Design a protein with these regions (language model features):
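Conserved ABC transporter NBD signature motif
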Residues: 61-72, 77
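Conserved ABC ATPase signature
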Residues: 93, 132-136
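Catalytic Walker B motif of ABC-type/P-loop ATPase nucleotide-binding domains
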Residues: 157-160
Length: 308
């Protein structure tokens, strides 16, 4: 049985002047999936999300979101999605409860008080109901924003770097909520720069210059990258990393405590570098599996080439 496609778009195009911000993007997201959107700033993530919900028009291509044509049915699409921007976009001079009741009124929910009560309980906002939104910490603001986005029980959640600037504990709790809702059938498309968040996605899509460069599960992307990675521990890790960064074949060299980690595509060149007295000689090296961070640093350093 074929899984239901909540997002199904083909060859999306968007230009600003001479610059192609989105260039032939094709994307399919199935019901109940958490799909991570990754890429450098300016890679086309936000523009794609805005085209999906009809906030900006495409310059080419098309497709459906929730079975509705993104070029013709934007108002109907927006009624069935929750869209959360990186910037907090609710009223800071209203309380948490007042903000949520206002959103319930905008969506003309039948039992607004019950809907607000239920979402406050689910999001753990009981102790914040009477607090002004402007007085909330970053983590609590994002939790309020998420509550407002799902108050009307959307079928699709579009999140644009929702946890930027939020502490690690709040980010983890936010993602726990996302997984709970995805388990109930909510579909999520979320952009992020955090590798720990990318690991929590069922599938990740990496964009560069408006093109999809690679996609798959986190393990598929990491193991299919072709990268070779080595790590070593020693007292001179910082000095070794500085030397190795300038050696042929070493695309990245990073220090983690007393360990140095290197990555590249050319195994022979890497092995020569770590054996060289001018590089990693004197440290005991062993090969390790590449991680997502290795892959994305590698992709950031390369010109965009669309995935086949």
């Amino acid at each position: 049985m074929t899984a239901e496609l909540v997002i199904d778009v083909h060859d999306l195009q968007k230009r600003y002047g001479e610059r192609k911000v989105v260039d032939g993007l094709t994307l399919a997201v199935t019901a109940g999936e958490i799909c991570g959107f990754l890429g450098a700033n300016g890679s086309g993530k936000t523009t794609t999300i805005r085209m999906l919900c009809g906030l900006i028009k495409t310059d080419g291509g098309g497709g459906t979101c929730l079975g509705l044509d993104i070029t013709k049915a934007a108002p109907q699409i927006r009624l069935q999605i929750g869209y959360m921007t990186q910037r907090f976009s609710f009223y800071e001079d209203l309380t948490v409860g007042e903000n949520l009741y206002f959103v319930a009124s905008v969506y003309e929910l039948a039992d607004r008080r019950e809907a607000v009560r239920a979402i406050i309980e689910r999001m753990g906002l009981e102790d914040r109901v009477d607090q002004l939104a402007g007085e909330l910490s970053g983590g609590w603001k994002q939790r309020l924003a998420l509550a407002a986005c799902v108050l009307h029980k959307p079928k699709l959640l579009l999140l644009d770097e929702p946890t930027a600037g939020v502490d690690a504990k709040a980010r983890r709790e936010f993602w726990d909520l996302l997984h709970d809702m995805a388990g109930e059938g909510l579909t999520v498309l979320v952009s992020t720069h955090y590798m720990d968040e990318a690991q929590r996605c069922g599938r990740i899509v990496y964009l560069s210059d408006g093109k999809i460069v690679v996609q798959g599960t986190p393990d598929e992307v990491a193991h299919g990258s072709g990268l070779v990675t080595y790590t070593a521990t020693g007292p001179d890790a910082d000095a070794a990393a500085r030397k190795l960064r300038n050696m042929p074949g070493v695309e990245a060299a990073a220090v983690f405590g007393s360990s140095v980690h290197i990555a590249g595509m050319d195994r022979a060149a890497l092995e020569k570098a770590i054996a060289s007295p001018e590089g990693g000689g004197g440290l005991k090296w062993h090969e390790v599996a590449p991680e997502l961070e290795d892959v994305f640093i590698h992709l950031l350093s390369k010109p965009a080439k669309a995935a086949s």
